[in-house]
Amino acid sequence: LYGVDLYGKKELPGLLHELAQIPGIYWIRILYCYPEEITDELINAIAAEPKVCNYLDIPIQHASDNVLKRMGRRTDQAELRAIIGKLREKIPDICLRTTLISGFPGETQEDFEELYRFVNEMEFDRLGVFPYSQEEDTPAATMEDQVPQEVKEFRRDELMELQQAIAFDKAEDMVGHILTVMIEGKVADEETYV
């Protein structure tokens, strides 16, 4: 949403182009971007600027249109597929991360299976799943069809097991590649860096 308060319109692509011109800045990373904010202009800016990391964290939350609608999300599965497809077409080596919610009120077994298939097909590089938490004073807290806690956790575990296999395959594909990395520090008492 960068720029809306200043210019009355979204200007993140322009900001990326300007930041990329600053000497001494080597990496620019967009940390969090809702699907509806990912425009062709943003994709083109990421693709065009070598200093902009080929990385996006896109919190899709779910892939079942039924659940997305109950959540009040502004995208559906077809739009999510189109966005991910465009990103991978324009930026083939992009790293995509997402977060999901298991057991949102009204999530059926069919909704969960649809989400599972979506994750399997999209093969995200990184993925986190959180069981829905019934927060007081939120619209979802009073929705009918609350999912039992053990079902939410089971579905989370199923998705994370799938993601582990996907991540393992992706890591195997990187064996032998030389990459530029940023070291944030050394793990105490180990020869490991993070």
Segments (PLM) and residue ranges:
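Contiguous mid-protein beta-loop-alpha structural module that forms a pocket-lining wall or clamp
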Residues: 107, 119-124
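Hydrophobic, well-ordered secondary-structure elements that form the walls
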Residues: 58, 99, 119, 127, ...
